[in-house]
């Protein structure tokens, strides 16, 4: 079983925000497999599906971003998933809109959901798919208001394609592993 965690904030007011792009990817996968989300065995919702014989557990934490590690640990422990079989999907303020980066391990890069997962797990050695949300002309002021803001019309067109490509990258990870997915999907989606 592969554990696929999309990060975001749980309230409807955060739907469509930059910070919730991880949710958009797992939602896209769940929709394509007609797999409804239901309450999980911890602070998360889950959807189960299968792709070419590989079981996938899609997870949406019901905690806020800064406490995502609670959901990750609960799902890992309940389903006895090893960290090499887990992929976390999140936004990345350090990457421009349209960029996808898969990594087998690494720092949190200032992403608080990743930071909490690393703290809870005691390691940064787990796969992640980062989706760029940075604008070329970053507005002055708080980064939190930026990440909690919605994409503008042009960005939304790009992000819709990025979500689709990211869903394909998740399926590649599930079948072929992180190294293969990195060679195929680390790119900018125009």
From Swiss-Prot:
EC number: 3.1.1.29
Reaction(s) catalysed by this chain's protein: an N-acyl-L-alpha-aminoacyl-tRNA + H2O = an N-acyl-L-amino acid + a tRNA + H(+)
A cellular component annotation (GO) from this entry: cytoplasm
Swiss-Prot/TrEMBL site (Stabilizes the basic form of H active site to accept a proton) positions: 91
Catalytic residue positions: 19
Site residues (Discriminates between blocked and unblocked aminoacyl-tRNA), renumbered to this chain: 9
Main enzyme class: hydrolase
Protein residues bound to tRNA: 14, 64, 66, 112
Any Gene Ontology biological process: protein quality control for misfolded or incompletely synthesized proteins
Keyword annotations from UniProtKB, A to Z: Cytoplasm, Hydrolase, RNA-binding, tRNA-binding
Domain of life: Bacteria
Subcellular localization(s) per the UniProt record: Cytoplasm
GO molecular function, one term: peptidyl-tRNA hydrolase activity
Summary of subunit composition and partner proteins: Monomer.
Family in the record: Belongs to the PTH family.
Record function comment: Hydrolyzes ribosome-free peptidyl-tRNAs (with 1 or more amino acids incorporated), which drop off the ribosome during protein synthesis, or as a result of ribosome stalling.
HAMAP family, alphabetized: Pept_tRNA_hydro_bact (MF_00083)
Protein's name in the database: Peptidyl-tRNA hydrolase
Organism: Chlorobaculum parvum (strain DSM 263 / NCIMB 8327)
């Amino acid at each position: 079983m592969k554990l696929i965690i999309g990060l975001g904030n749980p309230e409807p007011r955060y739907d469509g925000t930059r910070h919730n792009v991880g949710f958009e990817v797992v939602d896209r996968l769940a929709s394509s497999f007609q797999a409804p989300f239901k309450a999980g065995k911890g602070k998360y919702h889950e959807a189960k599906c299968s792709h070419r014989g590989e079981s996938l557990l899609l997870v949406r934490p019901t905690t806020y971003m800064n406490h995502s590690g609670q959901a990750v640990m609960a799902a890992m422990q309940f389903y006895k998933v090893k960290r090499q079989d887990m992929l976390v999907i999140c936004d990345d303020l350090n990457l421009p809109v349209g960029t996808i980066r898969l990594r087998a391990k690494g720092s949190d890069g200032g992403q608080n959901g990743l930071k909490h997962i690393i703290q809870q797990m005691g390691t940064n050695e787990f796969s992640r798919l980062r989706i760029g949300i940075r604008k070329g002309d970053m507005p002055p002021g708080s980064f939190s208001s930026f990440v909690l803001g919605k994409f503008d019309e042009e960005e939304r067109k790009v992000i819709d394609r990025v979500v689709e490509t990211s869903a394909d990258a998740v399926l590649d990870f599930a079948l072929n592993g992180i190294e293969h997915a990195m060679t195929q999907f680390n790119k900018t989606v125009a």
